[in-house]
Amino acid sequence: MANLVVHRGMATWGERLVPLGDFRAAAARAGRALPAPERAAATAAYGAPFADPTPVEGPFAKIAVCGGIYSNHHALAALLADAARRGAEAVYCLGDLGGFGPSPEKVWPLLERGGVRAIQGNYEESLASGREDCNCGYTDPRDNHFAELSYRYTERHCTPAFKAWMGTLPKRRRVRVGGRELLLVHGSPRRVNEFLFASTAPVPFLELLAAQNRCDAILCTHTGLHWHRRLPSGREVVNVGALGRPANDGRTEVWYALVAAGAGEAALDVELVPLPYDHEALAAEMRAERLPEEFVETVLSGWWTTCLEILPARERAASKF
């Protein structure tokens, strides 16, 4: 029997079992011009390549990209200083400015002073539209319990002006670095709350996702765990991790990505950067705001105490809890 991949809730392909070989073939087809009959058949089966009107920013030689600030103004200040020291020409944020941490309003002036170019994550979409929940994409009751506590706190501590500003942010950006075009999204090009984990994102699927969205690299966040994969086609996928909380590895640093033009027009240099910051000051502020002690423990220990149920088996096996 052919290897099968299950993809649920896919806007393009629907919920079904798809032979792995079909993904490889579709990825190859999406990357080149097709005769009309074959193009029609591929479009019927997989959907047309995405015609994206998003303007392309740049070109840049080097950019810094973060995701999931989660109200961590200490880490954001550290990022802006570190990115400038490393020669980044622009700083991008892939959304989720609030949540988890204290005093989300402290993030806004730092973003503006630092010229950070942000997009909407699920938090921005929900806060700007007055949604009742964060639309995080969790299915487990415990995950949803802590997500609700986090969202309610953030909702109460964001001014109407901040929420309205969130609603003006684009949902995606396209950026040229060297000779490569990058697509910046929150969860995935398909859904703001899709989790792209390293262990459950097969190469053929990523190839097809990049080909259909006509980009050389996809940069995303949402999972809170950083990873980078160079695909056989030369395309790349980078999950930049989270700036707002540790990566569930027992380290108190947080993570962001530096993306630079490499040697040759078609090359990228990607560096996933661990970033120290004053995590003890953040923990003290969280306690002063009476945020859940489980959140504080994560900041101080580097290990997640919540949002564990969403993790795939390999990522969960690396957890302490």
Predicted segments — roles?
Residues 66-67, 91-96, 100, 117-122, ...:
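Active-site neighborhood of phospho(di)ester-bond hydrolases with catalytic His/Asp-centered motifs
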Residues 113-174, 196, 200-217:
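Active-site neighborhood of divalent metal-dependent phosphoester bond hydrolases
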Residues 58, 83-87, 177, 211-214, ...:
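Glycine-rich phosphate-binding loop signature in dinucleotide/nucleotide-binding domains
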Residues 9, 13, 19-27, 32-47, ...:
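Acidic, His/Gly-rich catalytic cores of divalent-metal-dependent hydrolytic chemistry
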Residues 70-77, 99-102, 123-129, 190, ...:
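Active-site environment of divalent metal-dependent phosphoester hydrolases
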Residues 203-231, 235-243:
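Anionic-ligand binding region
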Residues 7-110, 114:
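N-terminal active-site segment of His-dependent metallophosphoesterases
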Residues 75, 97-114, 127-139, 195, ...:
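Metal-dependent catalytic neighborhoods of phosphoester/phosphodiester hydrolases
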